[in-house]
Swiss-Prot record:
Transmembrane segments: none
Record: residues binding Zn(2+): C98, C100, C125, H127
Binding residues for ATP: K240
Motif ('KMSKS' region): 237-241
Gene Ontology MF terms in the entry: ATP binding; glutamate-tRNA ligase activity; tRNA binding; zinc ion binding
Originating organism: Escherichia coli (strain SMS-3-5 / SECEC)
Signal sequence, start to end: none
Similarity section: Belongs to the class-I aminoacyl-tRNA synthetase family. Glutamate--tRNA ligase type 1 subfamily.
Alphabetically ordered keywords of this record: Aminoacyl-tRNA synthetase, ATP-binding, Cytoplasm, Ligase, Metal-binding, Nucleotide-binding, Protein biosynthesis, Zinc
Location(s), subcellular: Cytoplasm
Protein's gene: gltX
Protein name in the entry: Glutamate--tRNA ligase
Catalyzed reactions: tRNA(Glu) + L-glutamate + ATP = L-glutamyl-tRNA(Glu) + AMP + diphosphate
Length: 471
């Protein structure tokens, strides 16, 4: 049997991390078994579905490189198929027309609740032989079995059973002729030959209804697996108050897709004590029986740790392709300065996100208007004038501009003046970067370049001279 899974989001908003994890698990299961992964857009909610949301879902899937083998399919383009199946069910007696008014249904609901009963349709039209005009408004309901139970072996939670007496006759076509979500899902899974449905636990109550419809159609019933929800670190359901919940927001905040995928796969699944997984390892080791039944807690600090790991572990040239977008957002002109791959090597240890890297790298490419006030007050003092003059001249004398030779120039300055490296290094750092912190000074000065470094040292000396005149 060929394994076939699907990811079927509703385009009413962005792709959130819960949906991304479900997509990842479905994708991994298919890839692990050499099967196929289908993308289906469940856009039957015409009022809430938007083209922007569809685009956001596609963007998120593409950014995570969760490529699909079929689709995207759109439910709104399959209404003729759904209605043909409903008409067939009406002929076979597995569905019926219901003419009950909203007022009657509301009164029935209130009566049942007053008795402490679970609100459900009482089947009045199921057994009615009243004649109705062809144009009289009606819905179509599925004639759910009235006895027995529905049992399915959830691949994560184990056997789950629902009594058919708890399930009422589901509406499968509205009065306007449009099919309902639960019915469309059934026909789609049937037509697309889905073998395994991996989805959130909020769909568990839909499963027995969908199984009953599949059986009424003599269609194969897929295997189901329901993934637990994701909570914030406070134990409450993950929401915007816990930080970013949109996949593309994590892109915007400077996370690598490898980091988010690695974090999401471990958010409810484990393989021994291993924390870091390549995409190939995820595919190789992923199984549904290793997915936890318990809710997972989203921990941003852990994601940040993973992101920092991947910034330094992945090839700098690859990381640079993702950094480029953030550089563009900061409007930094990188034509005069180090290659982005070299910048990744320079700042990788210091920066936990690509956004942070882009926001702190400007001095490598563009001159700064002024020095950081605190750093200048502390290090650009009259006592720093001589070390800066000497190191400037030694840097100017370098014919082979390498980080090693820059280091020798700084060391030689300290030796000549008989001072510690800090007495030279700190004023030099503020002079060339405008700030009190940077990567290792020799590689920083080397990356900034000879001409620009000397110009900035002269600017710092002018700043010191002006400071002396004001005293």
């Amino acid at each position: 049997m060929k394994i076939k899974t699907r990811f079927a989001p509703s385009p009413t908003g962005y792709l959130h991390v819960g949906g991304a994890r479900t997509a990842l698990y479905s994708w991994l299961f298919a890839r692990n078994h050499g099967g196929e992964f289908v993308l289906r857009i469940e856009d039957t909610d015409l009022e809430r579905s938007t083209p922007e949301a569809i685009e956001a879902i596609m963007d998120g899937m593409n950014w995570l490189s969760l490529e699909w083998d079929e689709g995207p399919y759109y439910q709104t383009k399959r209404f003729d198929r759904y209605n043909a199946v409903i008409d067939q069910m009406l002929e076979e007696g597995t569905a019926y027309k219901c003419y009950c008014s909203k007022e009657r249904l509301e009164a029935l609901r209130e009566e049942q609740m007053a008795k402490g009963e679970k609100p459900r349709y009482d089947g009045r039209c199921r057994h009615s032989h009243e004649h109705h005009a062809d144009d009289e408004p009606c819905v179509v309901r599925f004639a759910n079995p009235q006895e027995g139970s529905v049992v399915f072996d959830d691949q994560i939670r184990g056997p789950i059973e629902f009594s058919n007496q708890e399930l009422d006759d589901l509406i499968i076509r509205r009065t306007d002729g449009s099919p309902t979500y639960n019915f469309c899902v059934v026909v789609d899974d049937w037509d697309m030959e889905i073998t395994h449905v991996i989805r959130g636990e909020d769909h568990i109550n839909n499963t027995p209804r969908q199984i009953n419809i599949l059986k009424a159609l003599n269609a194969p019933v897929p295997v189901y697996a329901h993934v637990s929800m994701i909570n914030g670190d406070d134990g409450k359901k993950l929401s915007k108050r816990h930080g970013a919940v949109s996949v593309m927001q994590y892109r915007d905040d400077g996370y690598l897709p490898e980091a988010l995928l690695n974090y999401l796969v471990r958010l409810g699944w484990s393989h021994g004590d291993q924390e870091i997984f390549t995409r190939e390892e995820m595919i190789k080791y992923f199984t549904l029986n290793a997915v936890s039944k318990s809710a997972s807690a989203f921990n941003t600090d852990k994601l940040l740790w993973l992101n920092h790991h991947y910034i330094n572990a992945l090839p700098p040239e690859y990381v640079a392709t993702h950094l480029q977008w953030h550089i563009e957002q900061e409007n930094i002109d990188t034509r005069n300065g180090p290659q982005l791959a070299d910048l990744v090597k320079l700042l990788g240890e210091r920066c936990k996100t690509l956004k942070e890297m882009a926001q702190t790298c400007r001095y490598f490419y563009e001159d700064f208007a002024e020095f950081d006030a605190d750093a200048a007050k502390k290090h650009l003092r009259p006592v720093a004038r001589q070390p800066l003059e000497v190191v400037r001249d030694k840097l100017a004398a370098i014919t082979d501009w390498t980080a090693e030779n820059v280091h020798h120039a700084i060391q030689a300055t300290a030796d000549e003046l008989e001072v510690g490296m800090g007495k030279v290094g700190m004023p030099l750092r503020v002079a060339v970067t405008g700030a009190g912190q940077s990567p290792a000074l020799d590689v920083t000065v080397h990356a900034i370049g000879k001409t620009r470094s000397i110009e900035r040292i002269n600017k710092a000396l002018a700043f010191i001279a002006e400071r002396e005149n004001q005293q």
